[in-house]
Curated annotation (Swiss-Prot):
The protein's name: Phosphatidylserine decarboxylase proenzyme
InterPro entries: PS_Dcarbxylase (IPR003817), PSD-A (IPR033175)
Organism: Geobacter sulfurreducens (strain ATCC 51573 / DSM 12127 / PCA)
Pyruvic acid (Ser) modification, residue list: S187
Pathways per UniProt: Phospholipid metabolism; phosphatidylethanolamine biosynthesis; phosphatidylethanolamine from CDP-diacylglycerol: step 2/2
Compartments reported by the entry: Cell membrane
Name of the encoding gene: psd
């Protein structure tokens, strides 16, 4: 499983290269046609924004092995009971909304083994709409911890973010706080925890992937 620690996620390289080349071409043309400077400035801004979007910062994960860390940067937009079909039980669901300004690298919420993966084709509704959980395109992992506890984490594509990237596969071993995927240009992460988890976040709270503790497993 890939787990790059480059300052910018490799998935961003093609976008940065295209925007960068266009910037250089327009910059060269602008020496002879000053009016083109506006286009040069525009594509330079785009290049910088794309690099900013795909930034891949290091994170310091809490030492408590029972702590479930946020899989994504963003804001908690849902917190409550929910049944997750791949787990087959009632769970505590926490949903995190990622705007285009958040880091979009996704991190493993716990250490454990990937028991199953799933991908569901679907719509591209605004991910702040709870229907997105059931109707949008999504990819998920079922993870089992060393103590036999199971949880699921689901990447949900959105109105703008229509490209889910997941490095993890069935049988892979995840390390809490380790990178396992990303979603391009804003989206949502749903995490389904055992109902006995001691929740440590509230609606509207900001999260930092790999650092914010969502809850403590029993």
């Amino acid at each position: 499983m890939r787990n790059e620690n480059t300052p910018i996620a490799v998935e961003g390289y093609p976008f940065i290269a295209i925007a960068g080349v266009l910037t250089l071409i327009l910059a060269a043309v602008s020496w002879h046609a000053p009016v083109v400077w506006a286009g040069t400035a525009f594509f330079l801004t785009v290049t910088l924004f794309v690099a900013f979007f795909f930034r891949n910062p290091e994170r310091i994960t809490p030492g408590n092995e029972n702590a479930v860390v946020a899989p994504a940067d963003g804001v908690v937009i849902y917190l409550g009971p929910a049944r997750e079909e791949h787990l087959g039980v009632e769970t505590t669901k926490i949903s995190i909304f990622m705007s285009v300004f958040n880091v979009h690298i996704n991190r493993a919420p716990v250490s454990g083994t990937v028991l199953d993966t799933f991908y569901v084709k679907g719509k591209f509704l605004d991910v702040r709409d709870d229907r997105a959980t059931f109707e949008n395109e999504q990819a998920g992992l079922v993870i089992e911890t060393a103590r036999g506890l199971r949880l699921a984490v689901v990447q949900v594509a959105g109105l703008i973010a229509r490209r889910i990237v997941c490095y993890a596969g069935k049988g892979d071993r995840l390390t809490r706080g380790g990178r396992y995927g990303l979603i391009r240009f804003g989206s949502r992460l749903d995490i389904y925890l055992p109902t006995t988890t001691e929740v440590k976040v509230a609606l509207g709270e900001k999260t930092v992937a790999g650092e914010t503790v969502l809850g403590i497993l029993p």
